Regions:
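Short, small-residue-biased leader/transition segments that mark boundaries at the very start
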Residues: 1-7
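Short acidic capping loops at alpha-helix termini that bridge into adjacent secondary structure
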Residues: 9-12
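Residue-level signal for inorganic ion chemistry
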Residues: 14, 117, 148
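DPxDG-like acidic metal-binding loop motif
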Residues: 15-49
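Catalytic-loop motifs flanking and including active-site residues across diverse enzymes
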Residues: 28-32, 102, 143-147
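Alpha-helical scaffold segments in soluble metabolic enzymes
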Residues: 35, 56, 124, 128, ...
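Surface "functional belts" at beta-alpha junctions
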Residues: 43-142, 170, 175-176
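Acyltransferase
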Residues: 137-183
Length: 183
């Protein structure tokens, strides 16, 4: 408990995955982070989920050529994914989009060279992306431990969010549905 108190007393910032992702998960995570920041007077750092997902590839934990493009993907149900295209330095090549994946979705990038797809939306996409430059990297999930380098960079750069007004990035509007089984 003593070491926990020391850490709490020195808390300068809280990092949170800001989306896209599960509506409920984002709301809970961001609410918890905002509460900690408000209560401790700490800064809020928002880390986009797709950047967080790319960290293992950037750190070389999974192989990818230096000139390759990387495409982190989150499953958005059916054949839709939330995806963003980066170079190996995590510079944005194409902004985040909700893609309905077919053989043509990433063709312009695949025709130029190697493209590495990963995340929980990637496996289903590989069924329709039939290209020799398409590579699936398995077993990459957005982990809190991978947030540290991205959060530290934002901390050093002074990229903080307004605790009172920050909201998660959902990408798509929430659509409420009636449950299939009524009680």
């Amino acid at each position: 408990v003593g070491s926990e108190m020391c850490i709490r007393d020195r808390l300068e910032a809280v990092a949170v995955s800001c989306g896209p992702g599960s509506y409920t998960g984002l709301r809970i995570g961001v609410s918890m982070a905002k509460g900690l920041c408000y209560g401790r007077g700490a800064k809020l750092i928002a880390v986009p989920t797709l950047e967080l997902l790319a960290v293992p590839v950037l750190l070389g934990e999974h192989p990818a050529e230096e000139d390759a493009l990387i495409v982190p993907m989150l499953d958005a149900r059916r054949m839709e994914v939330y995806a963003q295209v980066f170079d190996r330095a995590l510079r944005e090549v194409r902004p985040i989009q909700a893609d309905i994946v077919d053989a043509e979705t990433y063709k312009e990038y695949l025709d130029r060279g190697a493209v590495y797809f990963f995340g929980n939306g990637a496996a289903k996409c590989m069924e329709v992306i039939n290209h020799p430059n398409a590579h699936l990297v398995k077993n990459i999930e957005p982990l809190a431990k991978n947030m540290a380098p991205l959060a530290e960079k934002r901390f050093v750069e002074g990229k903080f969010e307004d605790v009172a007004y920050f909201v998660p990035f959902y990408l798509k509007d929430f659509v409420a549905k009636m449950p299939k089984k009524l009680i």
